[in-house]
Amino acid sequence: MAQNQQPIFQTKPPEQFVQIPINIERDSSTTRMNQTGNTIRKPNHWPTITISIIFVIIGQSIAKLLENFYYDKTNRSEYNENRQNDGVWTQSLLQTVGFPLLLLPFLIFITKNKRNHHQQPPITSDSIHLKSLAVIYICIGIIMSVQGRLAAMGKLEIPFGVFTLIYTAQLFFTPIFAAFINKIKFNRWVVISVILAIITGALTLSSSFGGEPDEAEENYARGSWAALFAGICFALLLCNIQNVFDSYIFKRTESTNQKPSFASVFEVIIFSSLVATIISVVGLLIAGEQHDLKREMNGFSKGKGSYVMAMVGQAVSWQVYWVGIVGLVYSVSSVLSNVISVITWPIVSVLVVIFFNFMDDEFDAFKGVALVTAVLSAAAYFFRLHKDNRMAY
């Protein structure tokens, strides 16, 4: 009888010994998530964060410059009220249609991870897991397409300064969604960073835009609602992307004792953009914008070649931007990703002053202060990340 009980007595301590460190590790990662929005990504990988920020700045700056160039050279001043919103589905499409460019780096990352670290591909073979991810990617793709169309419509309905003020509201909604969806709690440094980012976005109200409507074309009711819901959609988009990482991808790699791979960033962008592209193409065809594209190309003041280059350049630049934005969600959180996206607006506005001359736009005090608050906003968040990294060791 004693011999039969002996193996049972010996098997219990190993079970307790293995279980204790797992629980401690998860609890510690949850504590870090409550402070900065970071989960099991510990410590923060500064090279990845830095490269992602550079991608956001470069991608957003070039995309916005080419967008201004597109609207400035399509002679929109000659459009009547019925054609004011021409191209909104096209602009939404340009934000996602370049996703095939990410297939090559996606495959390279997968191959490298399998060869060097014997990691499984980012896409799991679990059918239940695949179905859940498929539903989430479809939802994210829908949000991406709707957000792109609403933002494009808002900029064509109201003055760009008003659009910017309303669109900045995304920074109010991102922390709210992050608290409910991602279970993030905020410390004072993150709150300070968000407040400074809101001020930065609001101070870019003096910026101009090539597709800005004339006074007779303004529709404040429709344009304001479009700008507001575009901001809400962007905040919801970022928080859902973080939910994909935290609830699916990171748990998947954690269960197999593997480190998260940046290939998952490309995975999220590619599948979500595929859905968004399909929706935008359908919307474009229903709205009849395919006929507008030919008319715009023929009437483009810089020629057909410049028109094609502007469109292709936007598609490529937006993919660079998305890699940076989703990379920041992957590395840190949806909140930092939104903060970085907004505080790069002053850089874009300064570049518009340099390359264009919309309504005698110039570098004024608002743009100068916006650049300062942008730096302070980033510094506040990075200071908190630095403290978290020190605590992690």
From Swiss-Prot:
Membrane topology: Multi-pass membrane protein
Compartments it resides in: Cell membrane
Transmembrane segments: 46-66, 90-110, 133-153, 161-181, 189-209, 225-245, 268-288, 308-328, 339-359, 363-383
Record GO biological process: cytokinin transport; cytokinin-activated signaling pathway; negative regulation of cytokinin-activated signaling pathway; purine nucleobase transport
Chief location category: membrane
Tissue: Expressed in seedlings, leaves, embryos, ovules, seeds and the root and shoot meristems. In heart-stage embryos, detected in cells that failed to respond to cytokinins, including the prospective cotyledons.
Pfam families: PUNUT
A single GO molecular function term of this UniProt record: purine nucleobase transmembrane transporter activity
Keyword annotations from UniProtKB, A to Z: Acetylation, Cell membrane, Cytokinin signaling pathway, Membrane, Transmembrane, Transmembrane helix, Transport
Family annotation (InterPro entries): PUP_plant
Source organism, top-level taxon: Eukaryota
Modified residues (N-acetylalanine): A2
Family: Belongs to the purine permeases (TC 2.A.7.14) family.
Function description: Purine permease implicated in ATP-dependent cytokinin translocation that controls the spatiotemporal landscape of cytokinin signaling. Depletes ligands from the apoplast, which leads to a suppression of the cytokinin response.
Name of the protein in its database record: Purine permease 14
Organism: Arabidopsis thaliana (Mouse-ear cress)
Gene: PUP14
